């Protein structure tokens, strides 16, 4: 990042978690992993939320769905330095950092919540998210 951005990992919220163990069949078919990231910004609190959504499926049957929201408080002077007019501009490095922290957290949540089930044998692999974020994201004050 060009300028140092100070932030604090404030909290996490498990928005959704569901398993469908009856759809799991032990065979040589690959498990498909889908993940996406969504961001929002609270201008009043200087808080950015990164939500990671993960879905695991096998042979077109959903095995697991999870959404984890992570909240990051951005230090006021850092937040001001990222504002352009009334908008907040999140650089790609910051988006990648928050996505990486959230994805790592959801990996742990999935492991912990599937303990004692057949799905615990499925380890969500690491994901280098840096290449997903090449441009800044603009958040408009509403």
Residue ranges of model-derived segments:
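N-terminal intrinsically disordered, cationic/polar leader segments
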Residues: 1-101, 108-142
């Amino acid at each position: 990042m060009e300028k140092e951005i100070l932030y604090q990992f404030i909290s996490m919220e498990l928005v959704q978690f569901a398993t469908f163990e009856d759809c799991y069949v032990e065979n040589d078919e690959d498990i498909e992993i889908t993940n996406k990231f969504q961001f929002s910004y609270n201008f009043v609190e200087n808080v950015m939320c990164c939500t990671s959504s993960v879905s695991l499926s096998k042979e077109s049957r959903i095995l697991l769905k999870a959404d984890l929201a992570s909240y990051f408080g951005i230090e006021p002077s850092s937040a001001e330095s990222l504002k352009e007019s009334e908008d907040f501009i999140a650089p790609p490095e910051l988006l990648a950092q928050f996505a990486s922290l959230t994805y790592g957290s959801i990996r742990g949540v999935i492991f912990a919540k599937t303990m004692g089930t057949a799905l615990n044998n499925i380890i969500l692999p690491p994901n280098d998210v840096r290449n997903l974020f090449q441009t800044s994201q603009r958040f408009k004050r509403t």
